[in-house]
């Protein structure tokens, strides 16, 4: 059977119209309460707040693990990171492991679906060439291979004391090293540089014969904080200065979509990789009503902001308390964009019906891993903590200087049940009053643990 050229063009146009552009923005160490639309009275975030008013705001959205590499592995693959050997990890310079090339990332899967793909900002899935973005489905990239604190200087702006444990912090464009973040001037300019590159990607990609996928992973507000001179010292805290800088970059990205007349054809997502690193004081964010922060399985560590705008699909100004997590982005976006399922099994579930107006996300439960240890499970209002040790930010020993980390404590929690509807702060253990709930959640935890153990796959190695 042969089709006329005109029909082929029409079919191509229909396919393209059905494939929205995607802009996925993920900040670093931004807490649940660090945006105006989530209650912050300190951080000026008008552009992100407007995005919320034009889209869907999640109040029970989770990072799959509360640390850099692990969370990014989940976002890129739709898998629990410990399934892939990257649980509880923040990979450093010269790491011998990374995300396996046998895994299909969101970049790979959307490129297979016909997308032009780009990543800008913090990568953190391995710094060897075989682990960098070109090997994982990205046509265009400008990245730092790991966190901005993994450099020779310290946490405090202006400190020139060099740390021998870290080499210079390299910059990569399309897999090739092009220089370094060499000083505090470069650190201050980091957010602006990432925002400008994102604008360029949109201007170069919009209106072409392919839809585009842009993954913008800002290095900030991870310490050491940087901010442009337009914001530095202008707000109540250094963290607020940095948040203002991030918000401007987000605003620039949104303006680029409008300028190229593709706003109505683009899904925009904003989220964070984990909760705030609370021992950095005025240089850290806020978890709001939630307990603890980064590196823990309490709500403050893993519950993060998430906003999704999709004109014509997502009703503006909605708020949902439906459960969802960053492992759900892969199946959701593949369904929305006409992609095919990954060759390997994943853990995420599509919440596309929720975006289209349903109240249910399709996720009834969430399991909280840290490293390879299952530490808690949530089903509906109930959250059961299994016995585990954790890093606590309560009653920290203060640092000698603002901007340096306070000393945390190691604490233990026993088998504990919390009603998150009545007790967001996880302070009132009601396990004794609800033994049937404890038993049900213990059985769920055992089942989830067994399923994950049965399907582990090798980490990438040099």
Question: Over which residues does each language-model region extend?
Answer:
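Formylglycine-dependent sulfatase
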Residues: 2, 11-416, 424-443, 447-462
């Amino acid at each position: 059977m042969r089709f006329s050229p005109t029909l082929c063009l029409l079919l191509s146009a229909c396919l393209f119209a059905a494939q929205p552009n995607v802009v996925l923005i993920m900040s670093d160490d931004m807490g649940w309460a660090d945006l105006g639309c989530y209650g912050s009275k300190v951080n000026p975030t008008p552009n992100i707040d407007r995005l919320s008013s034009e889209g869907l705001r999640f109040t029970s959205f989770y990072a799959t693990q509360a640390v850099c590499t692990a969370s990014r592995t989940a976002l890129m693959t739709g898998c629990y990171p410990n399934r892939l050997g990257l649980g509880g990890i923040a990979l450093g310079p010269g790491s011998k492991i990374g995300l396996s090339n046998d895994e299909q990332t969101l970049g790979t899967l959307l490129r297979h679906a016909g997308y032009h793909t780009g990543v800008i900002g913090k990568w953190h899935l391995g710094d060897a060439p075989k682990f960098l973005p070109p090997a994982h489905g990205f046509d265009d990239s400008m990245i730092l291979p790991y966190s901005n604190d993994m450099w020779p200087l310290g946490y405090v702006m202006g400190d020139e004391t060099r740390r021998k444990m870290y080499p210079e912090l390299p910059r990569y464009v399309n897999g090739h090293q092009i220089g370094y973040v060499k000083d505090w001037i470069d650190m201050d300019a980091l957010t602006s540089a990432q925002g400008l590159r994102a604008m360029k990607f949109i201007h170069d990609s919009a209106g072409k014969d392919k839809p585009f996928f842009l993954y913008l992973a800002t290095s900030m507000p991870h310490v050491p904080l940087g901010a442009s001179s337009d914001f530095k010292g202008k707000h109540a805290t250094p963290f607020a200065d940095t948040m203002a800088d991030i918000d401007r970059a987000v605003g620039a990205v949104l303006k680029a979509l409008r300028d190229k007349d593709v706003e109505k054809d683009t899904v925009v997502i904003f989220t964070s990789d984990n909760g705030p690193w609370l021992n950095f004081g005025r240089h850290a964010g806020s978890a709001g009503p939630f307990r603890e922060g980064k590196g823990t399985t309490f709500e403050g560590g893993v519950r993060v902001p998430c906003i999704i705008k999709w004109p014509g699909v997502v009703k503006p100004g909605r708020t949902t308390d439906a459960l969802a997590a960053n492992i759900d982005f892969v199946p959701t976006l593949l369904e929305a964009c006409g992609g095919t399922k990954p060759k390997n099994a994943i853990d995420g579930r599509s919440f596309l019906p929720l975006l289209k107006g349903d109240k249910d996300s399709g996720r009834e439960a969430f399991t909280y891993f840290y490293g390879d240890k299952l530490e808690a499970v949530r089903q509906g209002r109930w959250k059961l903590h299994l016995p585990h040790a954790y890093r606590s930010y309560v009653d920290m020993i203060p640092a000698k200087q603002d901007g340096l980390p306070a000393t945390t404590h190691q604490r233990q929690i026993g088998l504990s049940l919390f009603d998150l509807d009545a007790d967001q702060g996880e302070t009132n253990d009601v396990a004794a009053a609800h033994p049937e709930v404890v038993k049900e959640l213990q059985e769920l935890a055992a089942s989830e643990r067994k399923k994950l153990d049965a399907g582990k796959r090798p980490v990438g190695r040099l």
